[in-house]
A protein has these predicted regions:
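Juxtamembrane transmembrane-helix termini in multi-pass membrane transport proteins
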Residues: 3, 8-10, 14, 84-131
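Alpha-helical transmembrane segments of helical membrane proteins, especially in multi-pass transport
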Residues: 174-184, 205, 209-233
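Hydrophobic, lipid-facing residues on alpha-helical transmembrane segments of integral membrane proteins
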Residues: 34-38, 82-89, 93, 124, ...
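Transmembrane alpha-helix/helix-exit interface in multi-pass inner-membrane proteins
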Residues: 135-150, 163-191
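Hydrophobic alpha-helical transmembrane segments in multi-pass integral membrane proteins
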Residues: 140-142, 216, 220, 271-283
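Histidine-/acidic- and/or cysteine-rich, low-complexity loops and terminal segments associated
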Residues: 2-89, 113-114, 152-160, 179-200, ...
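Interfacial segments of multi-pass membrane proteins
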Residues: 108-113, 223-235, 244-250
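Interfacial loop-to-transmembrane junctions
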Residues: 245-270
Length: 283
């Protein structure tokens, strides 16, 4: 009888301890994510402000080239690339963390049910793999941006069509929001860890899961990220709009993510048409 009473009293006590541990982990995790977001957002804002203060290079066609694609006085190209990649990574943390944090928390929760050890380390490795993919995309974006900037400076005829080209790129990015490919990639980004797939339980598997998640996310955000690059990589308002779009479509209730993506697509298509209209003198 005493054993039964002890067991009965132990269950509520054990449940209380588990709930306390869960709450502590929940608030610690999200508190650290909030601090990381605030720090990266502040650094990004400061970088954008400093780049805006430098101005840009006026180009044929009535547009201005960002100094992000050009070396400052005394800078070497490796230095320019390192500076761009550093700020790109910080910017990606600020932009992607609001939609990534819930996925990392669900992964940590699923891990706690079956493993119970190294939860934070494995979650960090998933995040590291995720942002490693975004760093690689940043390197590719820098190479393409520098090449296009050099061509635009050497070929005035090409520079004159850049405003129309930007509008067409934005229009294409908006159209991408309506495709089945977008829906599939968005579904992969919203997939709950451990549901229908093997849960990554070791260091290598966690890293690979982060890489896979980063790939799906970068594919899903391809159109929106391209808008950021062509419209204004140092424009705080463009950055905020792209971040909001990514977060809303990723965190929408189950079954509504693609619908939200299409609504965003309508807005982007409208903006693309407006940019083209202004470029050809219709607006």
């Amino acid at each position: 009888m005493s054993d039964a009473r002890a067991t009965g009293q132990g269950r509520p006590h054990g449940a209380f301890l588990r709930h306390t541990v869960f709450r502590r982990a929940f608030f610690t995790f999200h508190g650290l994510c909030a601090l990381l977001f605030a720090a990266s957002a502040a650094a990004t804002f400061r970088w954008c402000a400093s780049m805006s203060a430098m101005g840009g290079m006026p180009m044929p066609g009535g547009w201005t080239m960002s100094m992000a694609w050009l070396p400052m006085c005394g800078q070497t190209w490796p230095g320019v690339a390192a500076s761009f990649l550093g700020m790109w990574l910080v910017m990606m943390v600020a932009m992607m963390l609001p939609s990534l944090a819930p996925t990392l928390w669900r992964y940590r929760e699923a891990l706690a049910r079956v493993a119970g050890k190294r939860l934070d380390l494995l979650a960090i490795l998933v995040g590291a793999g995720y942002f490693f993919i975004w760093t690689l995309w940043g390197l590719a974006a820098f190479a393409v941006g520098v090449a296009l900037a050099a061509l635009a400076m050497q070929m005035p005829a090409l520079a004159r069509v850049v405003p129309v080209a930007i509008g067409l790129v934005v229009l294409g990015a908006g159209a991408l929001q309506f495709t089945n490919w977008k829906a599939r990639q968005l579904g992969c980004c919203r997939e709950v860890p451990g549901c229908g797939c093997r849960l990554p339980l070791d260091v290598g598997a966690a890293w690979r899961y982060g890489l896979r998640l980063g790939l799906h996310c970068s594919y899903c955000c391809a159109g929106l990220t391209t808008i950021l690059l062509v419209v204004g990589v140092m424009d705080v308002w463009v950055m905020a709009g792209v971040t909001a779009a990514i977060t809303v479509e990723r965190l929408a209730p189950a079954g509504e993510g693609f619908g939200v993506a299409r609504v965003i697509g309508v807005v982007i298509v409208g903006e693309g048409l407006a940019l083209i209209g202004r470029a050809v003198g219709l607006g």
